[in-house]
Amino acid sequence: MALQIPSLLLLAAVVVLTVLSSPGTEGGNSERHFVHQFQPFCYFTNGTQRIRLVIRYIYNREEYVRFDSDVGEYRAVTELGRPDAEYWNKQYLERTRAELDTVCRHNYEKTETPTSLRRLEQPSVVISLSRTEALNHHNTLVCSVTDFYPAKIKVRWFRNGQEETVGVSSTQLIRNGDWTFQVLVMLEMTPRRGEVYTCHVEHPSLKSPITVEWRAQSESARSKMLSGIGGCVLGVIFLGLGLFIRHRSQKGPRGPPPAGLLQ
């Protein structure tokens, strides 16, 4: 079901063209009225984030051209509208397509503020290294900030507690299908042993900023850490196996049933 919201989003213009007949027309001077209507509609499908823009052009109660964002271009409804549709597709098509966001989505978020758009979605933050290399080699840290709403967000990089401003770059905000956003903020750096890099994220959904750390360490240190984790996992497995065997051995073999039960 499509929800039509003309009160705030419908910008309809009705132009009444009054054409006076020539003085020589029988019956004297009389007025002839021609009505040209321009009707844009924004549709929002209930329970989804789908938006549709439809613009109708009507002359004397007859629609002759239509733009539908689902189609993506102006289409002539009658032969009268064919020249206009061809011209508008050449001159104004990109601007009209953009109005799905600049008009419909923008006004819906700013004026209607429906329950689905009042929500605050907290971002997820993950740090990754673009290339696996040893210390003291140029590299790039990537802070992936995903699934947040609204779009306003501030992401900063810190090295050992000091904000980094050189070598920082960012993608544009990427809109997800559910209206949440994601962004990648990169930091070009040369990691040295003991350095701590922090991705600092501020967002309206957060009571306090999210901070995620990445520590520079050598391959040998990383290998030792992984070996330690693997040793702990194996230790837990063998401990559980030993307890299981001990529990089974304490039960002992079952003896024969009492003699009275065999009679």
From Swiss-Prot:
One GO molecular function term of this record is:
peptide antigen binding
User: Hey, what's the signal peptide range on this chain?
Assistant: 1-27
Q: What is one GO biological process annotated to this record? A: antigen processing and presentation of exogenous peptide antigen via MHC class II
Q: Where is the Ig-like C1-type domain?
A: 123-211
Could you tell me which residues belong to the region Beta-1?
28-120
One GO cellular component this record assigns the protein to is: external side of plasma membrane
Q: Map out region (Beta-2) in residue numbers.
A: 121-214
Q: Which SMART domains match?
A: IGc1, MHC_II_beta
Where is the protein localized? Membrane
Keyword list, A-Z: Adaptive immunity, Disulfide bond, Glycoprotein, Immunity, Membrane, MHC II, Signal, Transmembrane, Transmembrane helix, Ubl conjugation
- Write out the ranges of the annotated region (Connecting peptide): 215-224
Residues in the Extracellular compartment per record: 28-224
Regions crossing the membrane: 225-245
Q: How is it modified after translation?
A: Ubiquitinated in immature dendritic cells leading to down-regulation of MHC class II.
Q: List the disulfide bonds.
A: C42-C104, C143-C199
Sugar-modified residues: N46
Q: Which residues lie on this side of the membrane: Cytoplasmic?
A: 246-263
Membrane topology field: Single-pass type I membrane protein
Q: Which family does the UniProt entry place this protein in?
A: Belongs to the MHC class II family.
Q: What is this protein called?
A: H-2 class II histocompatibility antigen, A-K beta chain
Species of the source: Mus musculus
The organism's taxonomy opens as:
Eukaryota, Metazoa, Chordata, Craniata, Vertebrata
Q: Which gene encodes it?
A: H2-Ab1
